[in-house]
Structures are given as structure tokens and as C-alpha cells.
Amino acid sequence: MNRLTQLFAAKDRDILNVYFTAGYPKLDDTAVIIENLAAAGADLIEVGMPYSDPMADGETIQKSSMQALQNGMTVEVLFKQLREARERTDIPLVLMGYYNQVMQYGPEKFVREAKAAGVDGLILPDLPVFEYEREFRDIAEAHDMQVTFLITPQTATERIRQIGKLSTGFLYVVSSSSITGKSGEITTGQKEYFARIQALDLPQPKLIGFGISDARSFRTACEFANGAIIGSAFIRALGGAEDVALATREFVEGILEPVA
């Protein structure tokens, strides 16, 4: 059974999904970060594939992507690192990147090798729904690779229902229409949007992302979904760390600590 399926069957609340950019701060940090995220209590890890034109990402993730590429990160290197990490942890792993990267590598080859490296799911923000239905779904299903789609406050209800049916991993509920990394208090308008998504009673688990940055915003997001995704705040913590393993553990512990 896919590890994502196992996770959501075993736990349906307060799921912590942490995103980081593979190959950042240093090329060989990927496995160390994965192992320490798992050890510290993260439920799910979203591994970002560095890309030169990350259109959905804010400045923090863009800079980390450029640094990772300069460090020498490639898809081949990433798959090798993931295979090494998978030998030491069974935590669900999701790759987040862009469909252009998959197309350049070859879709079937990419999915096959990602699965062999221990990847459980994909998030590809630029993958059109029609392209997924026409070609990519069969490839993903053949390798038990779950695919997650994103919805935003501007996504029409009918479209949300369609995407909810197509997402085979979880539904990525984007908290705002801005790029990633814009943190702050979750607004009343955002809460109303989350409640609207809840009311649709969609079949897939829902994780809220974009702007989740600390224990308080994580807990608030979890009131409206099965869990939340934290990315830019973690990358900022890694950027200033002398000890990546320690910084990773301390970050997760800070997110999971009780909120007064």
C-alpha cells in the first residue's frame, strides 16, 4: 500500500507536512534533513526539485532553488539521495516540482525512477488537468504514484470538485493567491474560504499550504483541514544553521509545541 494511503488511514488530524528544497543549503544535506524531519515528528515530507523558473514560489524558495542548482543538484542526484534516505526511514515522501522537469526527463522514466527511489507522490503545479487525464494519469497509476493538485481561493466550486476527484494523494489547499512565503496571521477571509472547502465534503484529505510559518498558524490551519504544509519558514531556518540536523529537529519541535 502507498505510504500516503497508510498515513491518512492512520491519522486524519494535525498532519505536519514539511517542505524543503533538495540540495540546500548544501548538496549532501538532503538525506540528513529527511531523516531528522522524520525523527522529530513530521508526518510527511515534501521534497522540492530545484528549478530555474519556479513560478509558484516566493523569494525564499527561489533563492534556495538557485543555490541547490549551483551546488550541483540534478534529478539523477536527487533520486540517488532519496534511495539512500529511504534505507533509513519509512516516512511518506512527495516530490514537488514542475511538469516541465518531468517532460524533459521523460514522464514514464521519471515516475518509474522516482518510485524506485521511494517516492510516494507528486505535486506538479503546472500540470494541466487535461494533460493529466489524457496521458499522465495512466503512467502514475501504473507505478502507484499518487498525484496531488492545488486549489486556490479563486478556484470555482465545480472545478474544485473535479480536482478533488482527480487528486489521488491529498488536496493541496492554497491559503491565498500569492506566491509561497507570505506569512502572517490567518485572516477571517481565509478561514471562510477554508470552511467553504470543508463544506464541499471532498473525498481526499486536505492540507493547507502557503503562509503557514509557526505553531500558531499550523494549529489554526489544522482546525479547517487534515493538516498543513510549512516550507519557506523551514528553509529560512536552514539557511542560517551551522548544524542542519539540529536546526531541523528544533524547527519541527517548535511547530509541534502546544500553543498557549
Task: Name each model feature, range by range.
Residues 1-10, 27, 52-63, 70-83, ...:
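Active-site-adjacent beta->alpha loops and helix N-cap segments on the catalytic face
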Residues 16-20, 45-47, 93-97, 122-124, ...:
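Hydrophobic faces of well-ordered beta-strands that scaffold small-molecule active sites
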Residues 18, 37, 45-48, 114, ...:
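Conserved, mostly hydrophobic/aromatic
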Residues 27-37, 155-166, 200, 208, ...:
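Catalytic cores of alpha/beta
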Residues 41, 114-121, 140-147, 165-171, ...:
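Glycine-enriched alpha-helix->loop->beta-strand junction motifs that scaffold or abut catalytic
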Residues 42-53, 119-123, 127-130, 171-182, ...:
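Glycine-rich phosphate-binding active-site loops on the catalytic face of alpha/beta enzymes
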Residues 78, 195-204, 213-219, 223, ...:
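Alpha/beta catalytic cores of nucleotide-metabolism and tRNA/nucleoside-modifying enzymes
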Residues 145-181:
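Histidine/lysine/aspartate-rich catalytic loop segments that bind and position anionic ligands
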